[in-house]
Amino acid sequence: MRTIVLGAGIAGTLTAYHLLREGHEVTVVDRQPGAGMETSFANGGFMASSQAEPWAAPGVPLKILKWLGREDAPLLLRPSAVPQMWRWGLRFLANCTEARALASGERSLKLAHYSIAVLKQVREDTQIAYDEVIKGCIRVYGSAEAIDAAGRFYAKLAPLGLNYRVLDAAGCVAIEPALGPSAAKFAGGLFFPDEESGDCHKFTQAIASVCQQGGAALRYGTNVMALEASGGVITGVVTDKGRLSADRYVLALGSYSPLLVRPLGIRLPIVPVKGYSITVPAALWPGALTVPIADDERKFGLSRFGDRVRASGSAEIAGYDTTPNEARANGILKNATDLFPGFANCLDPATNRVWCGLRPMTPDDPPILGSSSYRNLFLNTGHGHMGWTFGCGAGKAVAALVAGKTPDIELTGYALDRFARHRQPQSD
């Protein structure tokens, strides 16, 4: 069976990896010069099932309104993006209820748990290294009220296997001593001992090398222009370097997925949400953190990758623009140095690497996985802010579906048809 995977990020590369193990002849196509060069390149690095708390939740619409006009707001909506996303926005608002938020959180948690288990197996099978840190994750909060609110949500997910402990500030410092200098600035946090972190880019590139050694054709530097279809099936891929064809196709182009399939009558409710990261050398910060830390109220995180430290966060809805905004990058740095004064020692414009990537967000948070209205086109997209967490599991599950097998995880809750309104294949 010949399969073309469109996209060489974490989702596409892991799909290719598992397809090879199913015996497929695999071609991966990506416009970048290598694997993991877009959203997978410099994300926060959290492999965190605790991120299953959806963005679409009660209280979020009011927060967005309060943040309007603030360049340093945790979530910034550019007016120029509104005309292109109003349908998505209405769906997002419809999901901002307690019941729907919990349902979305449960689906995300199930996929996260499955995916982390798959990651561990892949790591054992390949023996690759990617600056992984297997020490859990702490989410800190500024007040007892905020801790209680977070705890109430996570308590509802505990029956599904979410393991966490509530800590005061001293308890957080005991796990991550780098929090010591700012212990008076936060009330405490939640510790998730089963979580990990690591360099998604390194991991994706290493898996791509494994795929190449296993016989996959990696067509980097190749722009996908269009999909050709006839009789309810995809017949080929038009690229700037010629036409490609296969028996089956997997769409894993992240935020760009809707643009490719819209001419075919498929409507993917995905909008790009720009995120930021600033990566700095750790050498100038004696006692730099090793446990990944997320500040849930200020919406940023700090993680360690070997000799590097990365601050990440922010959500900016501004279309497909990936240009860094200095005010937003500085806002992340300000928050990071407030929580970790030692982080300030690392800041130097000559060595700081500011990066922006586009999170492919669905209006209810879980990704879109599974079949499409074209018999041989499969979807692995819309992973939002959890692409690194979801990538391994989503790749294995979709690969099983492509191979005609039943995935280990039930994909009904991640299917495109949960949004009900997407068109059928166009007639010839």
Ranges and model annotations:
Residues 148-160, 180-248:
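Helical element adjacent to the flavin cofactor pocket in flavoenzyme catalytic cores
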Residues 43-46, 51, 55-95, 180, ...:
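Active-site substrate-recognition segment that forms the wall
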Residues 7-9, 31, 36, 383:
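Glycine-rich Rossmann-fold phosphate-binding loop(s) that bind the pyrophosphate
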Residues 103-116, 139-149, 190-209, 323-330, ...:
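Short beta-strand to alpha-helix junction loop
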Residues 44-170:
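Dinucleotide-binding Rossmann-like beta1-alpha1 core, especially the glycine-rich loop
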Residues 2-28:
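N-terminal Rossmann-like FAD-binding beta1-loop-alpha1 element of flavoenzymes
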Residues 21-41:
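Glycine-rich FAD pyrophosphate-binding loop
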